[in-house]
Amino acid sequence: ALEDEEVAALKNAGFDEQLVADLQLFNTLIGNWDYALSLDGQGLWNTEVIELSDGKLVPVAGDFDLASWVTGKVLVTGPRDYLPELDDLVRQTRFRLSEIRLAVGDSRFGLAAARFLTHREAIELLIASAEIDPEGRENAMRHVDVFFEALSEVQVHGVDGLP
């Protein structure tokens, strides 16, 4: 992985755009709002970068200590007036997925969504068989349910309601 100083100096990382979209969806799935990831690599936060032998730079999601999948507490970053009738996890997930769709475009968002949908059952099986307490398992499964429901809503209805 690149050293912190090298990551801070990135100006034109040229990250793969689909990978960035996929990582943003992954962070949303686990309720990780404490990160920053850009195509050019500027302003990265809680994202590692590895350099392949051909010099290509690849971002890697990391530092999940504040993710609500881990803590059970949602760090709300979306505006309170965005779908206020929904609970924090649902609202935050919908808000973030809508932001991602706007940022990456319908095609990339659709491909990322399809990749996650393909793996939903495997994710659920891993959670069901993981050595975690019942409360942690319930929290993780709720994240999965909320994520996929929100993913469907954002794909079907678009990003209406964003401030």
Residues covered by each model-derived region:
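Catalytic-core segments of enzymes that bind and process phosphorylated/nucleotide-bearing substrates
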Residues: 1-163
